[in-house]
UniProtKB/Swiss-Prot annotation:
Family matches, as SUPFAM superfamilies: Ribosomal protein L16p/L10e
Xref: Pfam families: Ribosomal_L16
Keyword Ligase: no
Assembly, per entry: Part of the 50S ribosomal subunit.
Gene3D superfamilies according to UniProt: Ribosomal protein L10e/L16
Family of the protein in this entry: Belongs to the universal ribosomal protein uL16 family.
Keyword tags: Chloroplast, Plastid, Ribonucleoprotein, Ribosomal protein
Subcellular localization(s) per the UniProt record: Plastid, Chloroplast
Organismal lineage: Eukaryota, Viridiplantae, Streptophyta, Embryophyta, Tracheophyta
Name of the molecule in the record: Large ribosomal subunit protein uL16c
One of the GO biological process terms: mitochondrial translation
Gene: rpl16
Metal-binding as UniProt keyword: no
InterPro entries: Ribosomal_uL16, Ribosomal_uL16_bact-type, Ribosomal_uL16_CS, Ribosomal_uL16_dom, Ribosomal_uL16_sf
GO MF, any single term: structural constituent of ribosome
Length: 135
């Protein structure tokens, strides 16, 4: 599972996801990519599940790049706890994804293999996505 080695602060505000992604919205490494169409928090488990699905489907050959990293801690309160007494402890990590953001890239395979692998990875994501080709 992906997570930062160390952070400056243990806990973060939840924040808002306004507008579209201006960074990381162009294909940089591969030829094919999976692009987000909705805003969401994508957990490190979901990122890993998508990566595994793509790797398994592409078999040998082809390279996969994960273009998002979960750097936001999400805190959870214990069950049946009364209000107050501070913020919960960090439970898992999420990547903040805005519309237009590239999630995964793929290269070194034919289009139909890439399309199939990326469609399987997109089914692991909690948002609507689209398959795009560079050029």
């Amino acid at each position: 599972m992906l997570s930062p080695k160390r952070t400056r602060f243990r806990k973060q505000h939840r924040g808002r996801m306004k507008g579209i992604s201006y960074r990381g919205n162009h294909i940089s490494f591969g030829k094919y990519a999976l692009q987000a169409l909705e805003p969401a928090w994508i957990t490190s488990r979901q990122i890993e599940a998508g990566r595994r699905a793509m790797t398994r489907n592409a078999r040998r050959g082809g390279k996969i790049w994960v273009r998002i990293f979960p750097d936001k801690p999400v805190t959870v309160r214990p069950a049946e706890t009364r209000m107050g007494s501070g913020k919960g402890s960090p439970e898992y990590w999420v990547a903040v994804v805005k519309p237009g953001r590239i999630l995964y890239e793929m290269g070194g395979v034919t289009e139909n293999i890439a399309r199939r692998a990326i469609s399987i990875a997109s089914s692991k994501m909690p948002i609507r996505t689209q398959f795009i080709i560079s050029g």
